[in-house]
UniProtKB/Swiss-Prot annotation:
Pfam short name (any one): IGPS
Swiss-Prot/TrEMBL catalytic activity: 1-(2-carboxyphenylamino)-1-deoxy-D-ribulose 5-phosphate + H(+) = (1S,2R)-1-C-(indol-3-yl)glycerol 3-phosphate + CO2 + H2O
Pathway the protein contributes to: Amino-acid biosynthesis; L-tryptophan biosynthesis; L-tryptophan from chorismate: step 4/5
GO molecular function, one term: indole-3-glycerol-phosphate synthase activity
One GO process term, biological-process aspect: L-tryptophan biosynthetic process
Taxonomic lineage from the root: Bacteria, Pseudomonadati, Pseudomonadota, Betaproteobacteria, Rhodocyclales
Entry keyword set: Amino-acid biosynthesis, Aromatic amino acid biosynthesis, Decarboxylase, Lyase, Tryptophan biosynthesis
Presence of the UniProt keyword Amino-acid biosynthesis in the record: yes
Organism the protein comes from: Aromatoleum aromaticum (strain DSM 19018 / LMG 30748 / EbN1)
Protein name per its UniProtKB record: Indole-3-glycerol phosphate synthase
Phosphoprotein listed as a keyword: no
């Protein structure tokens, strides 16, 4: 499974090349202008933390390159409603088709079924995808430091800001985190999964915490599978979590959320 990320990014560049011809930027912008304002993604996370609760970005994910199909019975609208009832702060929905068996339609269905803000979880390589994300209804986008240079991330953060969207910037090591912190977004994701090997270690978040200045919200991502994992993070003042697989493997993902974070 060597360098999955490079394979994914190559496909993404091809998707953007084709997509931006089929739907030119002017067309996507017009679609965006017809939409209501985005839901407040950062505000939803801050409200949970202010109340003393864990802020959970609950992920809707059918499959992954490392695990294959995770959930056969995959109904995004139903899962979104279960997550909302389970106490999620926000949703994350995979829209990548080739590697994660996601789709924009899944994001649209999930968002329509609930009142939670929704992150488009995909591999963004071009500002066109930020407009595309808003056009499909996303309230936030993910920017991955391992996939982008700083100038590109700043451009995409500016586009997201102009559309009223939040940005979650994701890093995996100290060098990436130093780049991530040059963006203005308050949401700093630390991915415990190495996107080049897909190996997971919760120590990644703990090792990087001290580098994150006050005022930023650390979102720990990947590998949160048991209440002990949650307790470890909260004992270290990490109160925001992006969790998918642990919930996708139980019949009612909302109940899974409650049992993991209750």
């Amino acid at each position: 499974m060597s360098d999955i990320l490079d394979k994914i990014l190559s496909v993404k560049r091809d998707e953007v090349a084709a997509g931006s011809v089929a739907r030119p930027l002017a067309q996507v912008r017009a679609e965006v202008e017809a939409l209501a304002a985005p839901r407040n993604f950062v505000g939803a996370i801050r409200a949970k933390i202010a109340a003393g609760d864990a802020a959970v970005i609950a992920e809707i994910k059918k499959a992954s390159p490392s695990k294959g199909v995770i959930r056969e019975d995959f109904r995004p609208a139903e899962i979104a409603l279960q997550y909302e009832r389970g106490g999620a702060a926000c949703l994350s929905v995979l829209t990548d088709r080739q590697f994660f068996q996601g789709a924009p339609a899944y994001l649209q269905a999930a968002r329509a079924a609930c009142s939670l803000p929704v992150l488009r979880k995909d591999f963004l390589v071009d500002p066109w995808q930020v407009y595309e994300a808003r056009a499909m209804g996303a309230d936030a986008v993910l920017l991955i430091v391992a996939a982008l240079d700083l100038a590109a991330m700043r451009d995409m953060e500016a586009v997201a800001g102009s559309l009223g969207m939040a940005v979650l910037v994701e890093a995996h090591d100290a060098a990436e985190l130093d780049v991530a912190l040059q963006l203005s977004t308050p949401l700093v994701g630390i991915n415990n999964r190495n996107l080049r090997t897909f190996d997971v270690s919760l120590q990644t978040t703990l090792d990087l915490l001290a580098r994150v200045p006050a005022g930023r919200i650390v979102v720990t991502e990947s590998g949160i599978l048991a209440p002990a994992d949650v307790a470890l993070m909260r004992a270290n003042a990490v109160n925001a979590f992006l969790v998918g697989e642990a919930f996708m493997r139980v019949p009612d993902p909302g109940e899974g959320l409650r049992s993991l974070f209750g």
